[in-house]
């Protein structure tokens, strides 16, 4: 299935929306309009990007956007090749890769989320056009916008270890390294079940432990050990990891937003002093047991929050 993306001006978007009928209600966050035309999905995003998705994507894009052509996409690709991010990812992005990454491991509040994603050579130009990058460089709003698009065409597996289960496993002696090894391995196996593994060149894991440590903790064998690589700062070296990073971060951010709504407080990320203060407020209003259902109990923030309350 082909995917073609254009960056349009407001005027061009208005013209496009006048040519066919678009839905503008009940859309994912970041999406402005959506249409189905000649077996092709046309998505217009608030960012000004338009994605044509389907077997006839190129023909439909030429029909609806005659002033544009696939050359625009090629020019964008060539322009992007000049930037440092593409230079860093050039090796892996010449191959079909599964990348895996996690989010939430350094945050007191919220779950641990892990994603594995399969990115082919054909995906690279569209991912570059969409603006896929290391999730640590992206705002939460941009992550949500990108993830809503990525999950529609990238084969992936997203796993979430919620706080209550996380705390149970941690109490049994599971370290974060073991949790991540198990989740990464399961997510990768899930993706392998969705694709033709003969098309896979590499599995690239954002390294959080050395290979032998990962093997020890994963509970099951690495599916394709000879094709598996471990990369530090993997988001900047592999687009597959960058995609996995965005989707896992999206799941974490979405969950954090839901927690904030549920308790009517803005829950900060990380594990700093602001987190201690909010944790103390939650204990005072809802009790320590409730705090434990939305946080990682073994973090020092729990003890610090209780100390904040003692003088009160």
Swiss-Prot record:
Main location class: cytoplasm
Record localization: Cytoplasm
Reaction(s) this enzyme catalyzes, per UniProt: Endonucleolytic cleavage to 5'-phosphomonoester
Domain of life per record: Bacteria
RNase H type-2 domain ranges (all copies): 95-311
Cellular component, GO annotation: cytoplasm; ribonuclease H2 complex
Binding site for a divalent metal cation: 101-102, 206
Pfam hit, one: RNase_HII
EC number: 3.1.26.4
Molecular functions (GO terms): magnesium ion binding; RNA binding; RNA-DNA hybrid ribonuclease activity
GO BP, sorted A to Z: DNA replication, removal of RNA primer; mismatch repair
Cofactors that this protein relies on: Mn(2+); Mg(2+)
Keywords: Cytoplasm, Endonuclease, Hydrolase, Magnesium, Metal-binding, Nuclease
Cofactor note: Manganese or magnesium. Binds 1 divalent metal ion per monomer in the absence of substrate. May bind a second metal ion after substrate binding.
Listed NCBIfam families: rnhC
Family, per entry: Belongs to the RNase HII family. RnhC subfamily.
Purpose of the protein: Endonuclease that specifically degrades the RNA of RNA-DNA hybrids.
Designated name of the protein: Ribonuclease HIII
Organism of this sequence: Staphylococcus aureus (strain MSSA476)
Gene this protein is translated from: rnhC
